[in-house]
Amino acid sequence: IDHHGIDFPKPEENVYYYNSMNSEKPSAEPVTYWAYQIAGKKEDLWLALCGCIGDGFLPDFAKQAEKEYFELWRDVKTAFEGLYETELGRITRILSFALKDRTSNVVKMMKFLFSASSRDILEENRKNTMLLRYNQVNEKYQKLLEKARNFGRKGKLLYFQYGGELSISADI
C-alpha cells in the first residue's frame, strides 16, 4: 500500500500493490487510512486515526472516534488541531518519538502495541517505557521548539539549525 506518486515496476506474482495515486481518481490518503479500510478491525480505529493525523490527514472515520473515544478525541476542523489539541494527538506524538529511538526500544514498543489499547499508552507502568521516553524526548523537543520560535524568520520560512542526538526536525 502506498500513497506517493511514483512509478512502480510490475509486482511479482502473488504480490498485490495498491497506490491510491495511480487509481482512476488519484488521492493521497495515508497508508494507515487504507490499512484500516481494508482490515476493517474496529478495535484499531484509534491507531488508524493516530496514523492519519500524524500524516496531516483528517479521515472520514474521525467522527466515529469521537463517539468511541470521547475522552481522547473531540470534533476538530483539521488534522493538526487533532494532533496538538487532543489526547489521541498526544498518543500520536508519543508513537512518533518512540519510532525515533534506538532499534531495541522500537522493537519493545512494537511488541507492547500488539496487545495495547489507546488507554494503555497513556498509562505509566513498567510495561510502558514509551511514555517515560516520550517525556524525556518531549522535554528536549519543547526547549528546541521554544528556541526555534525565538529565532529569526524570513517570510513564511524559518531557518533553524540544531545539533544533538535527536532527529526531530520534521516535528519542529
Model-based region annotation:
Residues 78-133:
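Long, charge-rich alpha-helical interaction segments
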